[in-house]
Protein backbone atom coordinates (compact mmCIF):
# COMPACT_ATOMS: atom_id res chain seq x y z
CA UNK A 1 0.00 0.00 0.00
CA UNK A 2 2.94 2.32 0.63
CA UNK A 3 3.87 1.82 -3.04
CA UNK A 4 0.42 2.98 -4.13
CA UNK A 5 0.78 6.09 -1.98
CA UNK A 6 4.14 6.93 -3.52
CA UNK A 7 2.77 6.34 -7.02
CA UNK A 8 -0.23 8.59 -6.48
CA UNK A 9 1.97 11.27 -4.95
CA UNK A 10 4.09 11.17 -8.09
CA UNK A 11 1.03 11.41 -10.32
CA UNK A 12 -0.24 14.38 -8.32
CA UNK A 13 3.03 16.20 -8.96
CA UNK A 14 2.53 15.71 -12.68
CA UNK A 15 -1.05 16.91 -12.82
CA UNK A 16 -1.25 19.44 -10.00
CA UNK A 17 -1.53 23.12 -10.82
CA UNK A 18 1.34 25.39 -9.72
CA UNK A 19 1.13 25.78 -5.96
CA UNK A 20 0.30 29.41 -5.29
CA UNK A 21 -1.60 29.25 -2.01
CA UNK A 22 0.31 30.07 1.16
CA UNK A 23 0.10 27.35 3.80
CA UNK A 24 -1.62 28.15 7.12
CA UNK A 25 1.69 27.25 8.76
CA UNK A 26 3.33 30.36 7.30
CA UNK A 27 0.31 32.60 6.62
CA UNK A 28 0.13 35.34 9.25
CA UNK A 29 -3.61 35.72 8.68
CA UNK A 30 -4.16 32.59 10.75
CA UNK A 31 -2.40 34.14 13.77
CA UNK A 32 -4.66 35.98 16.21
CA UNK A 33 -3.72 39.62 16.94
CA UNK A 34 -2.44 40.69 20.33
CA UNK A 35 -5.19 41.14 22.89
CA UNK A 36 -7.74 39.11 20.94
CA UNK A 37 -8.70 37.28 24.12
CA UNK A 38 -10.77 40.28 25.22
CA UNK A 39 -12.91 40.17 22.08
CA UNK A 40 -16.41 38.70 22.25
CA UNK A 41 -17.17 35.24 20.91
CA UNK A 42 -17.95 35.51 17.21
CA UNK A 43 -16.18 38.85 16.81
CA UNK A 44 -14.33 39.32 13.52
CA UNK A 45 -10.63 39.80 14.27
CA UNK A 46 -9.35 39.96 10.69
CA UNK A 47 -10.87 40.08 7.23
CA UNK A 48 -9.59 39.58 3.68
CA UNK A 49 -10.63 38.38 0.26
CA UNK A 50 -9.57 34.79 -0.27
CA UNK A 51 -5.97 34.90 -1.56
CA UNK A 52 -6.82 32.60 -4.47
CA UNK A 53 -9.92 31.73 -6.44
CA UNK A 54 -11.95 28.84 -5.07
CA UNK A 55 -12.23 25.47 -6.76
CA UNK A 56 -14.37 22.35 -6.75
CA UNK A 57 -12.85 19.01 -7.72
CA UNK A 58 -9.73 21.10 -8.51
CA UNK A 59 -11.56 23.17 -11.15
CA UNK A 60 -11.93 26.91 -10.58
CA UNK A 61 -15.48 28.01 -9.80
CA UNK A 62 -16.87 31.34 -10.97
CA UNK A 63 -18.51 33.13 -8.03
CA UNK A 64 -19.11 36.79 -7.32
CA UNK A 65 -16.98 37.03 -4.16
CA UNK A 66 -15.37 35.17 -1.29
CA UNK A 67 -13.78 36.22 1.98
CA UNK A 68 -11.85 34.75 4.87
CA UNK A 69 -12.62 35.89 8.41
CA UNK A 70 -10.53 35.25 11.49
CA UNK A 71 -13.08 34.82 14.26
CA UNK A 72 -12.82 34.81 18.05
CA UNK A 73 -13.85 31.45 19.45
CA UNK A 74 -12.84 29.13 22.27
CA UNK A 75 -11.63 25.57 22.75
CA UNK A 76 -13.20 22.71 24.69
CA UNK A 77 -12.10 24.20 28.00
CA UNK A 78 -13.22 27.78 27.39
CA UNK A 79 -9.76 29.08 26.50
CA UNK A 80 -9.65 31.82 23.89
CA UNK A 81 -8.80 30.77 20.36
CA UNK A 82 -9.36 32.05 16.82
CA UNK A 83 -10.66 30.14 13.81
CA UNK A 84 -10.78 30.99 10.11
CA UNK A 85 -14.05 30.76 8.23
CA UNK A 86 -14.69 31.19 4.51
CA UNK A 87 -17.72 33.07 3.17
CA UNK A 88 -18.78 32.46 -0.43
CA UNK A 89 -21.15 34.73 -2.37
CA UNK A 90 -22.60 33.47 -5.67
CA UNK A 91 -24.01 35.76 -8.34
CA UNK A 92 -27.46 37.15 -7.50
CA UNK A 93 -27.17 35.89 -3.94
CA UNK A 94 -30.03 36.15 -1.47
CA UNK A 95 -28.59 37.96 1.59
CA UNK A 96 -31.29 36.46 3.81
CA UNK A 97 -30.26 32.82 3.23
CA UNK A 98 -27.01 31.26 4.47
CA UNK A 99 -25.85 27.66 4.52
CA UNK A 100 -23.13 26.77 7.03
CA UNK A 101 -21.41 23.77 5.47
CA UNK A 102 -19.03 21.77 7.65
CA UNK A 103 -16.64 19.68 5.55
CA UNK A 104 -15.37 16.19 6.37
CA UNK A 105 -11.82 17.39 7.04
CA UNK A 106 -11.08 14.31 9.18
CA UNK A 107 -7.46 15.30 9.80
CA UNK A 108 -5.20 16.48 12.62
CA UNK A 109 -3.06 18.72 10.42
CA UNK A 110 -3.71 22.43 9.88
CA UNK A 111 -2.64 22.10 6.24
CA UNK A 112 -5.86 20.15 5.72
CA UNK A 113 -8.02 23.12 6.84
CA UNK A 114 -11.01 23.82 4.55
CA UNK A 115 -10.06 27.50 4.14
CA UNK A 116 -6.80 26.32 2.57
CA UNK A 117 -8.02 23.24 0.76
CA UNK A 118 -10.89 24.92 -1.11
CA UNK A 119 -8.58 27.37 -2.86
CA UNK A 120 -7.40 26.81 -6.41
CA UNK A 121 -3.74 25.83 -6.23
CA UNK A 122 -3.98 23.99 -2.91
CA UNK A 123 -2.19 20.62 -2.96
CA UNK A 124 -3.90 17.39 -3.98
CA UNK A 125 -3.67 16.21 -0.38
CA UNK A 126 -6.74 18.40 0.27
CA UNK A 127 -8.88 16.31 -2.08
CA UNK A 128 -11.52 15.72 0.63
CA UNK A 129 -12.34 19.43 0.75
CA UNK A 130 -12.46 19.57 -3.03
CA UNK A 131 -14.98 16.71 -3.04
CA UNK A 132 -17.02 18.48 -0.38
CA UNK A 133 -17.02 21.65 -2.48
CA UNK A 134 -19.02 19.73 -5.09
CA UNK A 135 -21.87 19.57 -2.56
CA UNK A 136 -21.65 23.29 -1.82
CA UNK A 137 -21.86 24.18 -5.51
CA UNK A 138 -25.59 23.32 -5.95
CA UNK A 139 -26.47 25.63 -3.07
CA UNK A 140 -24.35 28.41 -4.54
CA UNK A 141 -26.02 27.87 -7.89
CA UNK A 142 -29.40 28.46 -6.25
CA UNK A 143 -28.28 31.73 -4.67
CA UNK A 144 -27.43 30.76 -1.11
CA UNK A 145 -24.45 32.26 0.63
CA UNK A 146 -22.24 29.44 1.89
CA UNK A 147 -19.96 29.71 4.92
CA UNK A 148 -17.50 26.94 5.78
CA UNK A 149 -15.51 27.16 9.04
CA UNK A 150 -12.18 25.62 9.98
CA UNK A 151 -14.04 24.13 12.90
CA UNK A 152 -11.11 22.05 14.16
CA UNK A 153 -9.39 25.31 15.09
CA UNK A 154 -5.68 26.16 15.09
CA UNK A 155 -4.80 22.93 16.93
CA UNK A 156 -6.51 20.72 14.33
CA UNK A 157 -8.62 18.85 16.87
CA UNK A 158 -10.32 16.22 14.72
CA UNK A 159 -13.19 14.44 16.57
CA UNK A 160 -13.20 16.98 19.43
CA UNK A 161 -16.91 17.78 19.71
CA UNK A 162 -17.05 20.96 21.76
CA UNK A 163 -14.26 22.65 19.82
CA UNK A 164 -15.98 21.78 16.54
CA UNK A 165 -19.44 22.84 17.66
CA UNK A 166 -18.34 26.10 19.25
CA UNK A 167 -16.29 27.07 16.20
CA UNK A 168 -19.24 26.39 13.91
CA UNK A 169 -21.53 28.57 16.02
CA UNK A 170 -18.98 31.38 16.34
CA UNK A 171 -18.52 31.33 12.58
CA UNK A 172 -22.27 31.85 12.20
CA UNK A 173 -22.17 34.64 14.77
CA UNK A 174 -19.45 36.33 12.73
CA UNK A 175 -21.14 36.18 9.34
CA UNK A 176 -24.31 37.67 10.81
CA UNK A 177 -22.20 40.71 11.71
CA UNK A 178 -20.55 40.94 8.28
CA UNK A 179 -23.20 42.90 6.37
CA UNK A 180 -20.92 45.86 5.56
CA UNK A 181 -18.71 43.74 3.31
CA UNK A 182 -20.59 40.50 2.55
CA UNK A 183 -24.10 41.93 2.35
CA UNK A 184 -25.47 39.15 4.57
CA UNK A 185 -28.39 40.39 6.66
CA UNK A 186 -28.17 40.20 10.44
CA UNK A 187 -31.56 38.45 10.51
CA UNK A 188 -30.67 35.96 7.78
CA UNK A 189 -31.94 32.40 7.98
CA UNK A 190 -29.09 29.96 8.57
CA UNK A 191 -29.06 26.19 8.14
CA UNK A 192 -26.22 23.77 8.88
CA UNK A 193 -25.16 20.78 6.80
CA UNK A 194 -22.39 18.25 7.18
CA UNK A 195 -21.56 14.69 6.21
CA UNK A 196 -19.38 12.24 8.16
CA UNK A 197 -16.78 14.35 10.01
CA UNK A 198 -18.83 17.39 9.01
CA UNK A 199 -21.87 15.86 10.70
CA UNK A 200 -19.87 15.59 13.93
CA UNK A 201 -19.24 19.35 13.89
CA UNK A 202 -22.79 20.19 12.80
CA UNK A 203 -24.36 17.83 15.33
CA UNK A 204 -22.32 19.23 18.19
CA UNK A 205 -23.18 22.77 17.08
CA UNK A 206 -26.88 21.90 17.20
CA UNK A 207 -26.45 20.31 20.64
CA UNK A 208 -24.45 23.20 22.10
CA UNK A 209 -26.47 26.05 20.58
CA UNK A 210 -29.23 26.38 23.23
CA UNK A 211 -26.71 27.22 25.95
CA UNK A 212 -23.61 28.38 24.06
CA UNK A 213 -25.31 30.61 21.49
CA UNK A 214 -28.98 31.04 22.48
CA UNK A 215 -29.27 34.25 20.47
CA UNK A 216 -28.86 32.24 17.25
CA UNK A 217 -32.22 30.50 17.81
CA UNK A 218 -33.93 33.25 15.80
CA UNK A 219 -31.63 32.61 12.82
CA UNK A 220 -31.10 28.85 12.80
CA UNK A 221 -33.73 26.91 10.88
CA UNK A 222 -32.30 23.39 11.01
CA UNK A 223 -29.39 21.01 10.52
CA UNK A 224 -28.95 18.22 7.96
CA UNK A 225 -26.61 15.50 9.21
CA UNK A 226 -25.42 12.72 6.92
CA UNK A 227 -23.39 9.69 7.92
CA UNK A 228 -24.01 11.02 11.41
CA UNK A 229 -21.02 10.49 13.75
CA UNK A 230 -22.19 10.19 17.36
CA UNK A 231 -19.76 7.55 18.65
CA UNK A 232 -16.08 7.86 17.66
CA UNK A 233 -15.21 4.63 19.47
CA UNK A 234 -17.54 2.68 17.18
CA UNK A 235 -15.87 4.18 14.11
CA UNK A 236 -12.43 3.21 15.44
CA UNK A 237 -13.64 -0.35 16.01
CA UNK A 238 -15.31 -0.52 12.59
CA UNK A 239 -12.30 0.74 10.63
CA UNK A 240 -9.37 -0.87 12.46
CA UNK A 241 -7.44 -3.04 10.00
CA UNK A 242 -9.55 -1.96 7.02
CA UNK A 243 -9.02 0.29 4.02
CA UNK A 244 -10.15 3.20 6.20
CA UNK A 245 -7.85 2.44 9.14
CA UNK A 246 -6.28 5.89 8.68
CA UNK A 247 -9.25 7.36 10.51
CA UNK A 248 -7.89 5.80 13.72
CA UNK A 249 -4.49 7.57 13.96
CA UNK A 250 -6.02 10.79 12.60
CA UNK A 251 -8.75 10.71 15.26
CA UNK A 252 -6.38 9.79 18.08
CA UNK A 253 -4.06 12.60 16.99
CA UNK A 254 -6.92 15.09 16.86
CA UNK A 255 -7.91 14.24 20.42
CA UNK A 256 -4.25 14.37 21.50
CA UNK A 257 -3.96 17.87 20.04
CA UNK A 258 -6.62 19.03 22.51
CA UNK A 259 -5.97 16.79 25.52
CA UNK A 260 -2.29 16.64 26.69
CA UNK A 261 -2.93 13.87 29.24
CA UNK A 262 -4.62 11.77 26.58
CA UNK A 263 -1.59 12.23 24.32
CA UNK A 264 0.76 11.19 27.11
CA UNK A 265 -1.15 7.94 27.71
CA UNK A 266 -1.23 7.16 23.98
CA UNK A 267 2.52 7.32 23.65
CA UNK A 268 3.02 5.34 26.83
CA UNK A 269 0.82 2.53 25.56
CA UNK A 270 1.78 2.36 21.86
CA UNK A 271 4.41 -0.20 20.92
CA UNK A 272 7.89 1.07 20.14
CA UNK A 273 7.60 -0.25 16.60
CA UNK A 274 4.36 1.66 15.99
CA UNK A 275 5.35 4.97 17.61
CA UNK A 276 6.32 6.62 14.33
CA UNK A 277 3.18 5.27 12.69
CA UNK A 278 1.06 6.96 15.36
CA UNK A 279 2.97 10.23 14.96
CA UNK A 280 2.10 10.16 11.27
CA UNK A 281 -1.49 10.78 12.34
CA UNK A 282 -0.65 14.49 12.47
CA UNK A 283 0.92 14.49 9.00
CA UNK A 284 -1.80 13.31 6.63
CA UNK A 285 -5.03 14.74 5.32
CA UNK A 286 -7.72 12.09 5.10
CA UNK A 287 -6.99 11.14 1.48
CA UNK A 288 -3.33 10.52 2.23
CA UNK A 289 -4.19 8.79 5.50
CA UNK A 290 -6.39 6.27 3.71
CA UNK A 291 -3.47 5.35 1.47
CA UNK A 292 -0.71 5.47 4.06
CA UNK A 293 -2.46 3.59 6.88
CA UNK A 294 -4.60 1.19 4.81
CA UNK A 295 -5.24 -2.06 6.70
CA UNK A 296 -3.01 -1.05 9.63
CA UNK A 297 -4.13 -2.57 12.92
CA UNK A 298 -4.19 -0.56 16.14
CA UNK A 299 -6.37 -2.62 18.48
CA UNK A 300 -6.58 -6.05 16.82
CA UNK A 301 -4.19 -8.58 15.31
CA UNK A 302 -0.83 -9.96 16.39
CA UNK A 303 1.09 -6.85 15.34
CA UNK A 304 -1.36 -4.28 16.66
CA UNK A 305 0.02 -0.83 17.48
CA UNK A 306 -1.36 -0.96 21.02
CA UNK A 307 -0.32 -4.27 22.63
CA UNK A 308 -3.18 -3.96 25.12
CA UNK A 309 -5.70 -3.77 22.29
CA UNK A 310 -9.06 -2.30 23.19
CA UNK A 311 -7.91 -2.25 26.79
CA UNK A 312 -6.48 1.18 25.95
CA UNK A 313 -10.02 2.53 25.75
CA UNK A 314 -10.65 1.46 29.35
CA UNK A 315 -7.79 3.59 30.69
CA UNK A 316 -9.39 6.27 32.87
CA UNK A 317 -8.02 9.29 30.98
CA UNK A 318 -8.66 7.73 27.58
CA UNK A 319 -12.19 6.61 28.46
CA UNK A 320 -13.08 10.00 29.93
CA UNK A 321 -11.70 11.90 26.94
CA UNK A 322 -13.51 9.80 24.37
CA UNK A 323 -16.77 9.76 26.35
CA UNK A 324 -16.72 13.56 26.52
CA UNK A 325 -16.59 13.64 22.72
CA UNK A 326 -19.24 11.03 21.96
CA UNK A 327 -22.45 12.94 21.29
CA UNK A 328 -24.38 9.70 21.80
CA UNK A 329 -23.30 9.68 25.46
CA UNK A 330 -24.43 13.22 26.24
CA UNK A 331 -27.50 13.79 28.43
CA UNK A 332 -30.61 15.85 27.73
CA UNK A 333 -28.76 19.08 28.47
CA UNK A 334 -27.41 18.66 24.93
CA UNK A 335 -30.79 18.27 23.25
CA UNK A 336 -30.97 20.36 20.04
CA UNK A 337 -33.60 23.06 19.88
CA UNK A 338 -33.70 23.27 16.07
CA UNK A 339 -35.16 20.86 13.48
CA UNK A 340 -32.86 17.91 12.71
CA UNK A 341 -32.68 15.80 9.54
CA UNK A 342 -30.47 12.71 9.53
CA UNK A 343 -29.77 10.57 6.47
CA UNK A 344 -27.66 7.46 6.93
CA UNK A 345 -26.90 4.23 5.09
CA UNK A 346 -27.91 1.03 6.86
CA UNK A 347 -24.87 -0.70 5.35
CA UNK A 348 -22.44 1.91 6.70
CA UNK A 349 -19.28 0.03 7.72
CA UNK A 350 -17.42 3.18 8.83
CA UNK A 351 -20.03 4.92 10.98
CA UNK A 352 -22.34 2.12 12.21
CA UNK A 353 -25.97 3.14 12.04
CA UNK A 354 -26.76 1.46 15.38
CA UNK A 355 -25.30 4.46 17.20
CA UNK A 356 -27.56 6.82 15.27
CA UNK A 357 -30.52 4.72 16.39
CA UNK A 358 -29.45 5.26 20.01
CA UNK A 359 -29.13 9.02 19.51
CA UNK A 360 -32.49 9.13 17.74
CA UNK A 361 -34.18 7.27 20.61
CA UNK A 362 -32.55 9.46 23.26
CA UNK A 363 -33.45 12.74 21.61
CA UNK A 364 -36.99 11.60 20.90
CA UNK A 365 -37.48 10.33 24.46
CA UNK A 366 -36.28 13.69 25.76
CA UNK A 367 -38.85 15.56 23.70
CA UNK A 368 -36.99 17.00 20.71
CA UNK A 369 -39.26 19.30 18.73
CA UNK A 370 -38.45 17.94 15.27
CA UNK A 371 -36.27 15.00 14.21
CA UNK A 372 -36.65 13.39 10.78
CA UNK A 373 -34.53 10.28 10.21
CA UNK A 374 -34.22 8.85 6.68
CA UNK A 375 -32.53 5.44 6.67
CA UNK A 376 -31.15 4.20 3.34
CA UNK A 377 -31.31 0.39 3.27
CA UNK A 378 -28.99 -0.25 0.31
CA UNK A 379 -26.10 2.16 0.81
CA UNK A 380 -23.01 2.49 2.96
CA UNK A 381 -20.92 5.43 4.09
CA UNK A 382 -19.22 6.33 0.81
CA UNK A 383 -22.15 5.91 -1.55
CA UNK A 384 -24.57 7.69 0.79
CA UNK A 385 -22.45 10.82 0.37
CA UNK A 386 -23.93 11.13 -3.11
CA UNK A 387 -27.20 9.20 -2.78
CA UNK A 388 -28.28 11.14 0.31
CA UNK A 389 -27.25 14.61 -0.88
CA UNK A 390 -30.42 15.30 -2.92
CA UNK A 391 -32.54 14.42 0.12
CA UNK A 392 -30.49 16.79 2.27
CA UNK A 393 -30.81 19.60 -0.26
CA UNK A 394 -34.55 19.00 -0.59
CA UNK A 395 -34.95 19.17 3.19
CA UNK A 396 -32.78 22.29 3.48
CA UNK A 397 -34.68 24.09 0.72
CA UNK A 398 -37.95 23.30 2.48
CA UNK A 399 -36.60 24.91 5.64
CA UNK A 400 -35.54 28.06 3.79
CA UNK A 401 -38.95 28.17 2.07
CA UNK A 402 -40.69 28.06 5.45
CA UNK A 403 -42.46 24.74 4.90
CA UNK A 404 -43.68 22.89 8.03
CA UNK A 405 -41.23 20.52 9.71
CA UNK A 406 -41.92 17.10 11.15
CA UNK A 407 -43.51 17.44 14.58
CA UNK A 408 -41.76 15.24 17.08
CA UNK A 409 -39.95 12.27 15.57
CA UNK A 410 -40.35 10.43 12.28
CA UNK A 411 -38.13 7.60 11.04
CA UNK A 412 -38.51 6.24 7.51
CA UNK A 413 -36.57 3.36 5.96
CA UNK A 414 -36.23 3.58 2.18
CA UNK A 415 -34.63 1.25 -0.35
CA UNK A 416 -32.53 4.27 -1.28
CA UNK A 417 -32.65 7.93 -0.32
CA UNK A 418 -32.94 8.73 -4.01
CA UNK A 419 -36.63 7.99 -3.35
CA UNK A 420 -36.94 10.76 -0.75
CA UNK A 421 -40.02 12.86 -1.66
CA UNK A 422 -39.63 15.70 -4.18
CA UNK A 423 -35.90 15.35 -4.84
CA UNK A 424 -35.94 15.56 -8.65
CA UNK A 425 -34.97 19.24 -8.78
CA UNK A 426 -32.30 18.72 -6.14
CA UNK A 427 -30.75 15.85 -8.07
CA UNK A 428 -30.53 17.88 -11.26
CA UNK A 429 -29.11 20.85 -9.34
CA UNK A 430 -26.20 18.72 -8.13
CA UNK A 431 -25.19 17.59 -11.60
CA UNK A 432 -25.83 21.01 -13.14
CA UNK A 433 -23.73 22.61 -10.42
CA UNK A 434 -20.87 20.20 -10.97
CA UNK A 435 -21.05 20.80 -14.72
CA UNK A 436 -21.05 24.57 -14.19
CA UNK A 437 -18.02 24.41 -11.91
CA UNK A 438 -16.05 22.20 -14.30
CA UNK A 439 -16.81 24.38 -17.31
CA UNK A 440 -16.25 27.68 -15.52
CA UNK A 441 -19.83 28.98 -15.77
CA UNK A 442 -21.04 31.60 -13.30
CA UNK A 443 -22.71 30.15 -10.21
CA UNK A 444 -25.97 31.74 -9.14
CA UNK A 445 -29.70 31.88 -9.94
CA UNK A 446 -30.83 33.64 -13.09
CA UNK A 447 -27.40 33.39 -14.70
CA UNK A 448 -27.66 32.51 -18.37
CA UNK A 449 -24.61 31.73 -20.46
CA UNK A 450 -23.10 29.07 -22.64
CA UNK A 451 -22.01 26.28 -20.34
CA UNK A 452 -18.63 26.11 -22.08
CA UNK A 453 -16.68 29.35 -21.70
CA UNK A 454 -13.16 30.12 -22.88
CA UNK A 455 -11.96 30.68 -19.32
CA UNK A 456 -13.66 27.51 -18.18
CA UNK A 457 -12.20 25.45 -20.99
CA UNK A 458 -8.75 26.91 -20.36
CA UNK A 459 -9.05 26.17 -16.65
CA UNK A 460 -10.24 22.65 -17.35
CA UNK A 461 -7.38 21.85 -19.72
CA UNK A 462 -4.91 23.62 -17.46
CA UNK A 463 -5.43 20.94 -14.85
CA UNK A 464 -3.80 18.43 -17.16
CA UNK A 465 -1.45 20.26 -19.53
CA UNK A 466 0.68 23.39 -19.48
CA UNK A 467 -1.04 25.94 -21.72
CA UNK A 468 1.67 28.57 -21.41
From Swiss-Prot:
Residues spanning the signal sequence: 1-16
Active site feature: 196 (charge relay system), 348 (charge relay system), 381 (charge relay system)
Catalysed reaction equations from the record: a triacylglycerol + H2O = a diacylglycerol + a fatty acid + H(+)
Enzyme Commission number(s) from the entry: 3.1.1.3
EC primary class: hydrolase
GO terms, biological process: lipid catabolic process
Name of the protein this chain belongs to: Lipase 1
Annotated disulfide bonds: 112-285, 364-409
Family: Belongs to the AB hydrolase superfamily. Lipase family. Class Lip subfamily.
InterPro entries (UniProt xref): AB_hydrolase_fold, Lipase_secreted
Function: Secreted lipase that is able to hydrolyze both the neutral triacylglycerols and the monopalmitate ester Tween 40, allowing the use of hydrolyzed products as carbon sources. Has broad lipolytic activity, which may be important for colonization and subsequent infection, therefore contributing to the persistence and virulence in human tissue.
Superkingdom of source: Eukaryota
